[in-house]
Amino acid sequence: MRMFKPLFLALSLAIVIPTHATAVEIPATFQVQGAGYGHGVGMSQIGARAKALAGETATAILSYYYKDVVIEPLDDTKILRVNVGHLLTSAKMASGTQDATMQIYSGDIGDAQDVVPIAVVPIKSSLNFTIMGSTVLPSVVTGKKSVSIPRNRVFTVRWSGTRYLSGVDGVVSLTHNNTTKKYRYGQLQFRAVKTATLGYRLEITNSVRLSDEYLWGVSEVPSSWPEAALQAQAIASRTFAMSKAGIYRASCDCDLYGEISDQSFLGYAKETEKGWGHLWKAAVTNTVGLTLTQSGKPIAAYFSSSSGGLTETAGNAWGTQRGYTQSVPDLSSLDPVLNPRFYRWDRTITQASVSAAFVLPDVVNLEIVMKNASGTVATIKATSSAGIQKSLRGETFRSRTKIPSAYFDLVGMQNAVEPTPSPSP
């Protein structure tokens, strides 16, 4: 079996839609075959695990994936605003701890202690938040009874057992979009933010201390992984967060998102995961303050799940070169045992998705114009039924069409190769 070949994008011509003006056939779907998951820049998490299994240390792992960096302790106790709810119209918050208290304040009160709550939420009650015009409307719900609180642009909620409010250690739940997560630390802010096309939407942030309250809840790799891999991830995650801290983004009311667009923040469930959570917490604690730096400043320590056999540089992926990113061999990403889901993958993309990616009415042909040395697509060109041509960076195409990676080839088209047959069982 071939261990590495930047893999494939196959066009399905089984169903076609004739155009009104010409005989050009418009494919209904595009079948995709490739390798790796994510942008491939920086540390490969699958590669880090493989190196840890082989006995390498966290320092050795990080030094392999990041060029000319220093690993040194920095003060990482700053407070982060982590977005935990984006572009919402409503959300629900409740306390799941007996005798814990929950209080709501009008405004964004920061770290202030000399503030008076506008309401104390009774036990077995919840706080519901709804966008109302350009404001947020909170209501306290107890059983079937709902009491509204005067609207405001932003509210802060605190609960007992945190840095902000003494008392019984509380754990709160936050529910939106049919998903519930639990939070133990910091405080939550609920703000109405104006968007370009949707009007006002609800943005929810969790203000947490980076060094522990935040990092304990980061969920980027399984906590069951080897210690060195967990420590390498803890240092990379700390470094990435340090590079974002204090750079406020109005669109999310945050320093960074709690999703994979920055890095995944699961909250309290990560450190309390049965059987494994304490291992991740230990990895964070045992690497306290350790940060990847150049010239004394934290780097943007990019990482992704896996590559197509070679990692990618930031310049190739996004157009802005970062000297500490480099393309290095990452053959573990192509190991079906270590990377069973993404050593090779197959997807089907709709015509609508591809044409939307290129902002064209339709796409009848795709052509890879150039490839990077890593095997990722540098430029991919689309042609519409009217003959209009547009090009995209390969990483942009990946992001817009939601395929796993930019390591692919075209099949059955202008500069195509034959598809790789599926491995025998």
Regions from the language model: what does each represent?
Residues R2-P425:
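Conserved, single-site charged/polar hotspot
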